[in-house]
């Protein structure tokens, strides 16, 4: 995929989009019964591990606070239309390609800025999931005048991008990973120590272990790491490690070994499964576990938050069951249920996505596909990353990448600045704050078209958050 320089290249973008849209304020309401149901579900699912059951089909609607929200984002006039790059990954099974639709959150930020007369030009490029491709993407964006770059992919191949960015003094924000964080590279992922603590607390909680134990130790809780070798999991004292593969023959051997380990009752406790791997591998492994009747709690990797994972899981009879959890940060649609400032800011994002989805003339970042095809998956990290660069470029005195990099390092942004789901503090290389913990689904993801074809659109679930307050960071 090449660039689409026409996106945002017309400084009158906001005028065209505003003319297509009505001027009335969008009001989002959630009925009392929905809020009550989600609260009950949150309490129930958040405190116990149960025999997994398929969750009820979602309605396809997005919950939001019952408040008036401001969709437009206005920044101080600079007299320039800044150029910001977004790197994503296209290609079947290419490393990081699972996050391509999530990256459309950056398109939402661009749209909101245009509504507020603060247009930005977005250059969008495919890194092909290779280290060389990532390097070439950054080099191309730099040559085209990008003042900052959002890395909306995930995986070791991003080292090519971060190396090239550092050579050119161009700031980058990794929306979904933490490769080479530091020295002009900011990350919205959990930092390694924070991730380790949250995993440990989550495992102990799922196992029903006492909260008075050490938050750094599993204290005898049985854990089995299902390692596909394609992802990463924190370095914890797992009871067992099992190499897994999506290959059918290998999966049979994996299930046989796992059944043997699960049958060992000597410790008197049921094990917690930790799954790592690509989106496609995790989906296929979970589907195989379900077919084999294995119902142990599973902590899946963050790839479970992507469309390819959900689509592959649902194919051929798989289900998003209530024993599946993900360690992560609060999600936009769940945050929108809150009545505080963060909830209102997240509601603005959710309502803008819905507004854009209903405008058939709007395209995604590529300029080729209708935004409606990816609307359901557009997320907070990519939105917040583009927004942060917009703020930085609005405050520089010199319109250079070096100046943007310096200013970005001084920024602290929160809901009042329209960040979604969590605040940002760029004095740290790990800039995302807010609450982290165990994400659990409250509604089953479903095929919008009702089929099982790989071309069908998929509706995501709403992932709620069970927090561990000691691990939250503001």
Regions found by a protein language model. Give the residues of each.
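Extracellular/periplasmic Venus flytrap/periplasmic-binding protein
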Residues: 185-296
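Short beta-strand elements at the ligand-binding edges of bilobed clamshell
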Residues: 171, 178-202, 243, 316-332
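C-terminal region of N-terminal signal peptides and the immediate post-cleavage residues
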Residues: 39-64
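Terminal targeting segments of Actinobacterial cell-envelope proteins
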Residues: 1-26
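Segments of small-molecule ligand-sensing domains
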Residues: 362-386, 390-452, 470-473
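Extracellular/periplasmic periplasmic-binding protein-like sensory domains
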Residues: 289-383, 394, 466-471
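Beta-alpha junction/loop-to-helix N-cap segments that form part of ligand/metal-binding clefts
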Residues: 97-101, 116-181, 188-190
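Extracytoplasmic "Venus flytrap"
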Residues: 66-105, 113, 131, 374-376
């Amino acid at each position: 995929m090449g660039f689409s320089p026409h996106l945002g290249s017309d400084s009158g973008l906001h005028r065209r989009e505003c003319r297509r849209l009505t001027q009335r304020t969008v009001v989002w309401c959630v009925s009392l019964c929905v809020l009550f149901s989600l609260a009950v579900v949150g309490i129930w699912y958040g405190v116990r591990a149960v025999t997994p059951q398929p969750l009820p089909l979602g309605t396809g609607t997005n919950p939001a606070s019952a408040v008036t929200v401001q969709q437009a984002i206005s920044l101080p006039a600079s007299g320039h239309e800044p150029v910001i790059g977004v790197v994503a990954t296209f290609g079947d099974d290419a490393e990081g390609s699972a996050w391509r639709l999530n990256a459309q959150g950056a398109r939402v930020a661009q749209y909101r800025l245009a509504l507020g007369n603060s247009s930005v030009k977005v250059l969008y490029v495919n890194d092909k999931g290779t280290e060389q491709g990532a390097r070439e993407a950054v080099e191309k964006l730099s040559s085209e005048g990008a003042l900052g770059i959002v890395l909306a992919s995930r995986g070791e191949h991003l080292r090519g991008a971060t190396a090239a960015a550092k050579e050119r003094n161009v700031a980058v924000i990794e929306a979904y990973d933490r490769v080479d964080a530091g020295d002009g590279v900011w990350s919205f992922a959990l930092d390694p120590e924070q991730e380790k603590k949250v995993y440990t607390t989550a495992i102990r909680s799922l196992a029903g272990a006492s909260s008075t134990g050490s938050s750094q130790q599993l204290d005898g809780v049985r854990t089995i790491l299902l390692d596909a070798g394609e992802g990463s999991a924190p370095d914890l004292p797992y009871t067992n490690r099992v190499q897994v593969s999506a290959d059918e023959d290998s999966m049979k051997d994996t299930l046989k070994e796992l059944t043997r380990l699960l049958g060992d009752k000597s410790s008197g406790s049921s094990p917690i499964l930790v799954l790592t791997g690509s989106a496609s591998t995790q989906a296929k492994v979970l589907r195989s576990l379900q077919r084999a009747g294995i119902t142990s709690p599973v902590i899946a990797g963050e790839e479970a938050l992507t469309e390819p994972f959900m689509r592959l899981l649902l194919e051929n009879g798989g289900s998003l069951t209530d024993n599946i959890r993900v360690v992560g940060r609060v999600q936009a649609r769940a945050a929108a249920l809150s009545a505080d400032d963060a909830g209102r800011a997240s509601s603005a994002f959710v309502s803008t996505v819905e507004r854009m989805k209903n405008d058939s003339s709007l395209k995604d970042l590529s300029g080729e596909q209708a935004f409606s095809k990816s609307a359901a998956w557009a997320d907070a990290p990519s939105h917040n990353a583009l927004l942060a660069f917009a703020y930085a470029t609005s405050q520089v005195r010199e319109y250079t990448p070096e100046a943007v990099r310096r200013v970005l390092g001084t920024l602290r942004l929160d809901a009042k600045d329209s960040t979604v789901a969590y605040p940002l503090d760029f004095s740290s290389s790990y800039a995302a704050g807010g609450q982290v913990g165990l994400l659990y689904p409250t509604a089953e993801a479903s095929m919008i078209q009702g089929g099982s074809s790989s071309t069908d659109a998929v509706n995501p679930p709403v992932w709620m958050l069970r927090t561990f307050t000691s691990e939250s960071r503001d």
